Amino acid sequence: MIRTGFDEMYEADGQVRPHYRAFARWLAETPDELLAQRRREADLLFHRAGITFTLYGDEQGTERLIPFDTIPRSIPASEWRVVERGCIQRVKALNMFLADLYHEQRIIRAGIIPAEQVLANEQYQLAMQGLDLHRDIYAHICGVDLVRDGDGTYYVLEDNLRTPSGVSYMLEDRKMMMRLFPELFAAQRIAPIDHYPNLLLDTLRSASPLDDPSVVVLTPGRFNSAFFEHAFLAREMGVELVEGADLFVRDDKVFMRTTDGPKAVDVIYRRLDDAFLDPLAFNPDSMLGVPGLLSSYRSGNVVLANAIGTGVADDKSVYPFVTDMIKFYLDEEPILKNVPTWQCRNPAELSHVLANLPDLVVKETQGSGGYGMLVGPAATTAQIDAFRERIKAKPHAYIAQPTLSLSTCPTFVENGIAPRHIDLRPFVLSGRETRVVPGGLTRVALREGSLVVNSSQGGGTKDTWVVED
């Protein structure tokens, strides 16, 4: 059983952890009214900058501010180095799995992953079978979601290999903290993160075999929940932000419409799902994609980052096999552990899940954003019974895990400061080399007792510091 109750700032006896001592002294010496004023300034600055997300399912389609908490999540550098190595190891194995899956399928023949687990997965793309990619990289940009147990051990909760979001909030949170509290950064060595856009652009350029490829960011448009991030990253990289209608394919090559005439496009950082990329190949009703894009991609005339078909590797039903992938492809022991997982597609595991629903977290294998899940200890009897019937009807569509009490971090709440549950999403870039910007996005569940940190479910964010020991 995974233990729970780890606080990022305080030891079990209430003493401040060494890497938080400088911040704790500053917090104790700073008047409450000044802290409140700075928090109000942060809200105003975020609003002026347009740092919002769209809440799907909201009747008004409301754009909302991402709540930002000014107490940072701090990680000692020695601890971070382990996390960094673990994330790099994991993403390397996942890329090797994708290259293998779409070619020789050695891992299936070795009996490590059942064929039906991946080949019948709706995220598996037959169009990618046998297609060679530059450097054999499928997932150029990845987000690895981490949580901690009671003794501070990191566990990977899930991998995000399709269109991981949140990095713009990571960067804006840091800008905000440096603007509002410059004295904190002068008092200790905090690893910088402002070079991420340059690393991202270098990663995208290196995805092409060309010496000087042209890069664009493809967005579904301003009504997408992450549109702020799409525009932010395009601006920071100095590349064009385009929608599907801005691009066209001629002679199996992709061009961008400009006032000076067509301009060739070599690399597309796409922020829309596979199904909407090309109405000729996938969803014929898509108005967001580019007709003929798949043909151009298969001809090697354009690079897509991330590649089509990466979703099969971050599907929740494939998650339990990632540690086996690391051993199989890298011949290494996993640095970061998986959360124990029961697959409802297996009859014996299904029986265990159905018998223990009040104690488990159950997730749809295709779910995301905190939707399509049951948190047993927080659910009513009626909700548990309804979920039991859904699982029985489609057992292959669900996995279950023990309920984790995510680590907590002191957070400003209405009545002062209180612990709130957090997770961490480091961003991993795979190009000529695999790199991770120090820290990542810390998400915080602002509702007391809540374990759901997603912004779509009322979660907020914190700046993440990697502090020299």
Regions found by a protein language model. Name each.
Residues 1-469:
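Preference for protein termini
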